[in-house]
């Protein structure tokens, strides 16, 4: 058996605790009659984020393997700024996909799955609304750490730094590795009505890792994406956009078509520039 396939089996075994947590949350029926207000929001945020530390367990399978070097320190400040810009433009470009994915209607023979998917989406949305309905600025800061920084680090560490790299070592095809790991990244969240936006987001993070050779850029992009979503919700909650403005926790802002088209053009220009910049930086450091 190929040694990298053996690594994949070991990685999968060590990932079982995480997989079981995700699957149990998906199949367990949430009692919506119990108000979330009886639980302390800060404790829920911290406990949920600490559970993500389990995502580092598969590192034991490859910790002595130089093929999995993630090059945390090999980054430049200017590139990080451009990654911020690229991620922001992606959020705008991704908004029509979010709207389309939420409106998907299944054929009759999949009606049971559709009912289940909508129920889970509704339950998770209620939970998310409670978690991000911060009572004060301190809770908002805890939310940034629990929802943006910790998931950004540990999810990228596993899905891009370990799984994507392993798929590449097996297939020797970067594109296959990026798309397959992004598929797993999106599927394991067990939220169909956010599957495709999360898939494309994972693909973006995968290419950032591939071009740069450093997992830091993917982590920064992931954390910024979550930070932006939490901050927009908090700002709307505080009335910074006006009292009449309402923003759904999983709904993108209603953007005019011209804004989306302009954002797409800027996104394509920026991603080309970022790709060249990261590839050049990687070549300089290797040379």
Residue ranges and their predicted role:
Residues 51-64, 139-167, 266-279:
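Transmembrane alpha-helical segments in integral membrane proteins
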Residues 223-287:
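C-terminal membrane module of polytopic membrane proteins
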Residues 186-190, 194-249:
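Functionally important transmembrane alpha-helices
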Residues 154-180, 207-214:
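Membrane-interface helix/loop boundary segments of multi-pass membrane proteins
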Residues 14-25, 52-58, 86-90, 257-277:
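Hydrophobic core of alpha-helical transmembrane segments in multi-pass integral membrane proteins
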Residues 22-63, 77-88, 109-119:
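Alpha-helical transmembrane segments in multi-pass membrane proteins
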């Amino acid at each position: 058996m190929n040694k990298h396939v053996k690594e994949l089996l070991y990685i999968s075994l060590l990932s079982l605790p995480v997989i079981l947590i995700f699957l149990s949350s998906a199949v367990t029926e949430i009692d919506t009659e119990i108000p979330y207000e009886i639980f302390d929001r800060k404790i829920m945020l911290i406990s949920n984020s600490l559970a993500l530390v389990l995502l580092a367990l598969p590192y034991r399978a490859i910790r002595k393997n130089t093929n999995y070097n993630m090059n945390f320190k090999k980054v430049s400040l200017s590139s990080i700024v451009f990654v911020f810009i690229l991620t922001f433009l992606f959020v705008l470009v991704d908004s029509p996909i979010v709207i389309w994915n939420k409106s998907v209607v299944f054929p009759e023979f999949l009606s049971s799955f559709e009912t289940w998917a909508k129920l889970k989406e509704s339950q998770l949305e209620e939970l998310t609304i409670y978690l991000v309905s911060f009572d004060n600025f301190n809770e908002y800061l805890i939310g940034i750490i629990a929802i943006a920084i910790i998931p950004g680090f540990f999810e990228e560490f596993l899905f891009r730094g370990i799984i994507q790299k392993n798929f590449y070592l097996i297939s020797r095809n970067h594109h296959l590795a990026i798309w397959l790991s992004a598929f797993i990244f999106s599927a394991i969240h067990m939220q169909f009505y956010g599957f495709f936006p999360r898939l494309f987001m994972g693909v973006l993070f995968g290419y950032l890792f591939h071009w740069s050779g450093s997992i830091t850029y993917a982590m920064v992009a992931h954390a910024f994406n979550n930070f932006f979503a939490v901050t927009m919700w908090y700002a709307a909650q505080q009335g910074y956009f006006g009292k009449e403005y309402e923003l759904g926790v999983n709904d993108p802002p209603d953007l005019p078509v011209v804004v989306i088209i302009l954002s797409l053009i800027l996104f394509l220009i920026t991603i080309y520039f970022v790709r060249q910049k990261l590839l050049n930086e990687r070549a300089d450091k290797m040379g």
